[in-house]
């Protein structure tokens, strides 16, 4: 069942426009990096089974992120990228992103947000494999239905994992979160648009008295559809909502329709309809 039907009950076709908020943001983009206004956004992104946001990457600004964070030696993203194929189920896709979120500081341990679990989790990087087995692999009974038909002529190598008693420190994420893709060194379109959208979201949320965190996320795909925005509700029964082609004049409409009203705006929605 797709996310739109399962988690939200209503669609609205168009995003309300806030007059007087338009800015000529497209003129700041390079001529060889236009925004794709032709393609229907519905279905342009496969929503992952789980989305992990790495917060302990050590960067203060998104402009500092290298193009490929997963190649940064010694980083949690690199460690997980090396283990991913051996640990993660191909039937349960995991997206690993880096994010800059307000009021989250880096400590001695790795710190991540995990959705739709809606948990902030801390652990030592040496326990990364155990973390992945604990949080990023579905239960055995769920995996069983995806097992291939037995072939006696095919040699298989069993992947074993001995569970360790590790005390992963976790707590619920109590606030909604809005992230804007701002991975400048990956694509200049997101780098140019993100700071403007972040400021506009903060203003619109403040004007409505809403306590929602707003931050920046690394590459999530679809730079041609910038600005790319993900809304993570704090309600565990709701999945994240992915939008594309978000510009400043549409921010207030997203806050009113999606954050407050619980509606999906069809013209911006990158998930399956």
Curated annotation (Swiss-Prot):
InterPro entries: Aim32/Apd1-like, Thioredoxin-like_sf. Pfam families: Suc_Fer-like. Belongs to the AIM32 family. This is Altered inheritance of mitochondria protein 32. It comes from Debaryomyces hansenii (strain ATCC 36239 / CBS 767 / BCRC 21394 / JCM 1990 / NBRC 0083 / IGC 2968) (Yeast).
